[in-house]
Design a protein with these regions (language model features):
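Auxiliary Fe-S-binding modules of radical SAM enzymes
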Residues: 5, 11, 143, 149-250
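Conserved Radical SAM active-site core
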Residues: 1-140, 144-148
Length: 250
């Protein structure tokens, strides 16, 4: 009911999508999230429901003792229509072990997304850059995504996510410069040639920097949002109160 209360204030507004992500909660299982999705679907059948990172899904399915395909099918039957790309971070194990050892590994992340694609659910792909990784790690990450896209064609977009060093265990790592950011977007546009869309996260980059990315291969900005959970601001985003509607102008 608390989660539905977040949706209710937007009744009657021209929304197109609800995006559901959260942590790995030990008391919440797959059945809970299936019920949540089905209730949102019943309340606003016009909304597209995108939800749950591969990290969350990996935990749900293991807890339920289900295969990835069985778990994904349950969520799809409940009304889930697509997935975000969170939790990818950097695929290379030597980096992943240092920054997110407890998260699902690269093979697990890719399997969950491939399974979603096989069930006709589109997903997004991300890469967290600008921390302790090097250029070879970035190329390895993008290569694995490109290979899966060649196989399934199920990715909607690729979203590079700029590392922010506020309030985390890597606060001593300097952030990438705007020049480095723009260079990465341009390379991604050329290298990820089988992805129709390259998306920039304007809350993380800031509105002005996000506008610049449109001249470096980006063709979509993520997104028209209302940051009700404070997830962007708590992560040290450039935009501390990120809210943008279709009526706003950069």
């Amino acid at each position: 009911e608390q989660m539905l209360d977040i949706c209710r204030p937007y009744d009657g507004q021209p929304l197109t999508e609800v995006h559901i992500v959260g942590g790995v909660h030990p008391k919440m299982n797959l059945e809970f999230f299936c019920e949540l999705v089905s209730k949102i679907r019943a309340h606003r059948p016009d909304l597209h429901i995108k939800g749950f990172t591969a990290v969350e899904l990996d935990y749900m399915f293991r807890k339920a003792k289900l295969t990835v395909e069985e778990g994904m099918q349950k969520l799809k039957d409940a009304g889930l229509q697509s997935m975000p790309g969170g939790g990818a971070e950097i695929f290379h194990p030597e980096v992943r072990e240092q920054i997110c050892a407890d998260k699902v590994d690269a093979d697990g992340w890719l399997l969950i997304h491939e399974t979603a694609h096989k069930l006709s659910m589109h997903t997004n792909a991300t890469m967290l850059y600008g921390h302790i990784e090097n250029y070879a790690h970035r190329v390895d990450h993008m290569s694995r995504l490109r290979a899966l896209q060649d196989k399934t064609g199920g990715f909607n977009c690729f979203i590079p996510l700029k590392f922010r060093n506020k309030d985390n265990d890597m606060s001593d790592v300097p952030e990438s410069t705007i020049i480095e950011d723009l260079r990465l977007y341009a390379i991604a546009r050329l290298f990820m040639d089988n992805f129709a869309n390259l998306k920039a996260s304007w809350p993380m980059l800031g509105r002005q920097s996000a506008q610049l990315t449109l001249s470096f291969g980006v063709n979509d900005l993520d997104g028209t949002i209302d940051d009700t959970t404070r997830i962007y601001s708590m992560a040290g985003s450039e935009e501390q109160t990120p809210s943008m509607s279709t009526e706003d102008r950069c």
